[in-house]
Amino acid sequence: IKKKWFCPKLAKESAKAKRFKGVYLPYWTFDAKTETEYRGEYGKDRTVRNGDKEETVTDWYPTKGVYRETIDDELVCATTNHNQSMLQGLEPYRTEENKSYKPEYVAGFAAERYAVGLKEAFQMAKESIKFKLREAIESKIRTEKNADHVKNLKLSTRYYDVTYKYLLLPVWISSYKYKDKVYQFMVNGQTGKVSGKTPISIPKVIICLLYTSPSPRDYAASR
């Protein structure tokens, strides 16, 4: 927690992790080719004069097309025993470095069995992929049409050549105590990335707000 500026100094000095617990957590990962038909509208802004004032007007145009993308290692967590946002904070993993399972790899560590099945996991993966495809298509439209806005975007995606892998990924779990409250954190056993909650120093937050908030003079100057 040394890098957490808002964390109280005393917490940094007194925080001592309890025994680390090493565990292999279950994940599904999916590869697929996608083909997405899309249609929507893009807008271009222009400035017009209305009397003594200038106004921005947006002209809207229809657009449609097909977007293709290959999805590689879309990761879905298959455990329900841990805080999901904390687990997401550990990503990404270097899934391209996975190895075929051997009992000796997990010897001495706990290994959880999946709680999210393959079918459910693929639906979750598709929701995540859909979000990424929407962002990519919006960016494509803005670039190709030199557009300022995109709206009413509708997607229809087909998946083919879908493959999956079942992975056990290494995580270290621990916690520390500060002012009678226990704070849990996790460490990505592959990359060392840390995820978890830390206490907040209210005085530090106030100082930050005072330094970043505009002064009355700033408000007056901006009018």
Give, region by region, the residue ranges found by the protein language model:
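Charged, low-complexity helical/coil segments in non-catalytic cytosolic or luminal regions
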Residues: I1-K177
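Flexible loop/turn segments at secondary-structure boundaries
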Residues: E37-R39, K181-V182, K193, P203-K204
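Extended, hydrophilic extramembrane loops/domains of integral membrane proteins
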Residues: L169-S195
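Juxtamembrane/start-of-transmembrane alpha-helix segments at the extracytoplasmic/lumenal side
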Residues: T198-I207
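Conserved small/polar residues in nucleotide/adenosyl-binding loops
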Residues: Y211-R217
